[in-house]
Amino acid sequence: MWANFADFLGMTADHRDELGAHVSAAGGVQHAPARAHEIGSVVLQLFTKQPSRWAEPKIDDDTTRAFQAERERYDVAVAGAHDSYLINLSSPDRRLWRMSQRSFEAELRRCARLSLDFLVTHPGNATDGDYEAGLERNARGVTESLEAVEGPTGVLLELTAGSGTSVGATFENLQIIIEGIGEGQRHRVGVCFDTCHAYSAGYDLVEDYDSVWAAFDEIIGMDRLGLIHMNDSKHAFDSRKDRHETIGEGTLGTEPFRRIVLDERLARVPKVLETPKGDEGVAADRANLALLRGFRSG
């Protein structure tokens, strides 16, 4: 076991600023590092395909070389991907589950080809209401995919907001999935903590910040924390609704984000914005990153 999952992601003492954003891969993934640089970041998250389609594009040699060259040029310390919105590894529908597993494996294969550090995945939905079976199916799908694809990419299970029949909205759910991963692959699995999802799922980062992280450490372990999605929320605490908002303009306010940025336990954990860009485009990311960095100067 690594001292901290961030070690697995490649964070080093040379990169103290661990703040970044989800950036566009329009025109090809090789353009993402320049877009991260444009907002002043050495941490990025991207999609390796259209997230609302089943089509699985190949990453050719030229694209791989171009991405690696641009990543080196812009000194990107941590680069990862988020998987497709269509994937549901908790589905009781056998056909959909197999489609999801194959798609997830293809996602992981593209990530490995690009030497990405992480692949974030939502645990999915147990649409029949059998959550225990859904968690088992999810673990099986992740295990099969990791067994099929060797490489540097770790899988990060994202905490969900708990809407509908979704699984993964509790720390216990995520730990059950982790424990269900085959022992030979479990070291490649960690957790992505989304602030909006956590608050919507009933983890009160506003009024009970310390207790939230104490529970995370007790149930999952801080050594499994690989990424934090830094998102404010449009909805109330424990609403079970997933709508991201600009930092400080939602129901979380700025204080939880200030505490996260200054929390020494989280200092080396990459943190990625998924906040609305609106008409401002990259300027919105710059503004959010400036706000977060400003907490360090008082």
Language-model regions: role of each:
Residues 22-26, 49-51, 83-86, 124-126, ...:
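Active-site beta-loop-alpha junctions enriched in small/polar residues
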Residues 19, 79, 155, 191-192, ...:
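Residue-level marker for buried hydrophobic side chains located in beta-strands
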Residues 2, 8, 175-298:
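Histidine-acidic metal/acid-base catalytic patches
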Residues 31, 62-69, 99-102, 106-113, ...:
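Alpha-helical scaffolding segments of alpha/beta enzyme cores, especially the outer helices
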Residues 36, 82, 100, 111, ...:
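Conserved, mostly hydrophobic/aromatic
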Residues 34-40, 60-80, 107-115, 144-151, ...:
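Acidic (Asp/Glu)-rich catalytic clusters
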Residues 4, 89-190:
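Active-site acidic/histidine proton-transfer and metal-coordination neighborhood
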Residues 2-83, 87, 91-106, 298:
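N-terminal pre-domain/capping segments
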